Amino acid sequence: RGVISAIGDGPLQVGITGNRVGPEHGFGHIMGWYHEEPVLLIKASQGNRSIGWDFYPPGSPQYVVGDMTYAGYGETPNKWLTTDTNPTPVTWYAGKQYDECFLDESDWAPAGAGFDAVTNAADVLANFDTLYPDWAAQGYEIAGFVWWQGHKDHTDGVYAPRYEQNLVNLIQSLRTDFNAPNAPFVVASIGFGGGAVGDKPANYQLVHNGQMAVGDPAQYPGFAGTVKSVNTLPYWRTL
C-alpha cells in the first residue's frame, strides 16, 4: 500500500527485498556500478494513484472548477459542490498517499490522525543506524529522487491540466521534507503504449508534456542542473 513492505541489507538481487521486484533492480544496479560509495534504495510505490488527489503535496491549495470545489491537502472528499458548506468526508484525504509514503506520522495532515501507523521512508532514515549498522558511523546522504507516475492523472479531466504545477509542488515538497534542497530529481514520463506523444489523447499529452517541462531549464530555471526528465515512450515493449 505504498509503504515499505520489506527491508534488505545486502547486494541488490531477487529476494533481498521480498518476493516482488520492480524497476528498482535495473536502476539500482546502474547506480551501484556508477558510484564508488554504497547506494541505498528506498522505494515507496503504489499503483492507481494521482498527484491530483492521493499524492497531493503538503501545502497544495483548494481550488474551484465550474461548480465544484476540489480538496486542498489534508481535506476530504476529493470534490464537492461549492454550494455545499458541509461536504460528507470519505475514508481518504488529499495527500494521504504522500503522507503514508514519506512522512512521520506526527507530520501527517490532521485528517490522518485516525489511521494506523506505517513503516515508510521516514522510518527507514530515522532507524538507519539500527537497520544498517555497518554504515552507522558513515551516515547517509539523500543523493537524489526518482519519480515515475502519472497514468491515473491523465484519466481525469481536472487533474491532467494541473499535473505540471502539482509536480513542481511535489518536487519542492520532497526536497523540503527530506532536507535535500538541491538533491537531483529525475522524472520518468508516462509511457503506456509507446509511440509518439502527439498521437496520444489530449489529457495524456498534458501529463506527459508537464513531466518533460519540469526538466527544461528554459521553462524552470530554478530546476536547472538538478531536475531531469526522461521520456519513457521509446522504451515501451509489447509482450
Region locations from a protein language model:
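Cell-envelope and extracellular/periplasmic
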Residues: 1-239
